[in-house]
Swiss-Prot record:
Pfam families xref list: THF_DHG_CYH, THF_DHG_CYH_C
Gene Ontology CC: one annotated term: cytosol
Taxonomic placement: Bacteria, Pseudomonadati, Pseudomonadota, Gammaproteobacteria, Moraxellales
Biological processes, Gene Ontology terms: L-histidine biosynthetic process; methionine biosynthetic process; purine nucleotide biosynthetic process; tetrahydrofolate interconversion
EC number: 1.5.1.5, 3.5.4.9
Protein known as: Bifunctional protein FolD
Subunit architecture: Homodimer.
The keyword Oxidoreductase appears for this protein: yes
Catalytic activity: (6R)-5,10-methylene-5,6,7,8-tetrahydrofolate + NADP(+) = (6R)-5,10-methenyltetrahydrofolate + NADPH; (6R)-5,10-methenyltetrahydrofolate + H2O = (6R)-10-formyltetrahydrofolate + H(+)
Tree of life domain: Bacteria
SUPFAM superfamilies tied to this protein: Aminoacid dehydrogenase-like, N-terminal domain, NAD(P)-binding Rossmann-fold domains
Organism: Psychrobacter cryohalolentis (strain ATCC BAA-1226 / DSM 17306 / VKM B-2378 / K5)
Length: 298
């Protein structure tokens, strides 16, 4: 999809970027790869998830990731630590998982209790097992277009765009949000795809004017429906990475009502970006297991 085709898309014909359906297709491929790893090594690819404390939302996310592992035949190693865990104790657990040949990927569930130095703990994850793309070294390698596992949500978004044959080169991209795990890596991935990228955030003046010129918009700011539908220009690609529960299910960071009559393509909420985030985590863990088994062809 070129700039010309984006700007000329007829109203009402927007493509729904269905992350749930794509993730299901990819899982079938991953199961075949997992079986091949088992056949060669006798080991089952495994993802270790570390949950510190008893936050219900975090526990739900960890359970969802464990279920995704099971669907492709992987092992899920759930490490639960009490909320009084110290930074040193958490680092010791990460070192233990780093050294285990039975662990191929490590995920430290965000957020950890406030007294723990989360960033310092992220940095202790072995780069070869950083399948959630949280280390500074991994980010730097990704930014320089070297081999690394990308942060899962932006990497999942890029895969979703690729699978729908959306050509990004030359597009004006606006990323709303600058978090270390979403906004910043998203902007860098789009830059590496030859977009002209603007990053907007809480101090941005006149957000509307930036949105109105965007060929591709990524809502990654964590504010319900901050970006209004009438700001979106005709034919834009709309990616909503937010989710905020409501009585009717949930909304994202972008007002999606009527967007099918404006955009050329958009992600639904829910069912767009979320499934691709977890799918990317599993896919990158399988990648790591293949590398450990000498099956990587890249």
């Amino acid at each position: 999809m070129s700039i010309a085709s984006i700007t000329s898309t007829a109203q009402g014909s927007a493509t729904v970027l269905d992350g749930k359906a794509l993730a299901k297709q990819i899982e079938q491929q991953l199961r075949t790869r997992v079986d091949a790893i088992k056949a060669k090594t006798g080991r089952t690819p495994s993802l270790a998830t570390i949950l510190v404390g008893d936050d219900p939302a975090s526990a739900t996310y960890v359970r969802m990731k464990g279920n995704a592992c099971k669907r492709v035949g992987m092992d899920s190693i759930r490490v639960e630590m009490p909320s009084v865990t110290t930074t040193a104790e958490l680092m010791a657990k990460i070192y233990e998982l780093n050294s285990s040949p039975d662990v191929h990927g490590i995920l430290l569930q965000h957020p950890v209790p406030a007294h723990i130095d989360e960033r310092a703990c992220f940095e202790k994850i072995d780069l070869a097992k950083d399948v959630d793309g949280v280390t500074c070294l991994g980010f730097g390698r990704m930014a320089m277009q070297q081999s690394a596992y990308g942060s899962c949500t932006p990497q999942g978004i890029m895969h979703l765009l690729e699978q729908h044959n959306i050509e990004l080169a030359g597009l004006e991209a606006v990323v709303v949000g600058r978090s270390a795990i979403l906004g910043k890596p998203m902007a860098m991935m789009l830059l590496n795809a030859n977009c002209t990228v603007t990053i907007c955030h809480s101090r941005t003046q006149d957000l509307e004017s930036h949105i109105k010129r965007a060929d591709i918009i990524v809502g990654a700011v964590g504010v319900p429906e901050l970006i209004k539908a009438d700001w979106i220009k005709a034919g834009a690609v709309v990616i909503d990475a937010g989710f905020h529960p409501t009585d009717n299910g949930g909304v994202g960071d972008i007002e999606l009502q009527g967007v099918e009559n404006i955009a050329s393509a958009y992600t639904p909420v829910p069912g767009g970006v979320g499934p691709m985030t977890i799918n990317t985590l599993i896919r990158q863990t399988v990648d790591a297991a293949e590398k450990a088994a000498g099956l990587d062809n890249s």
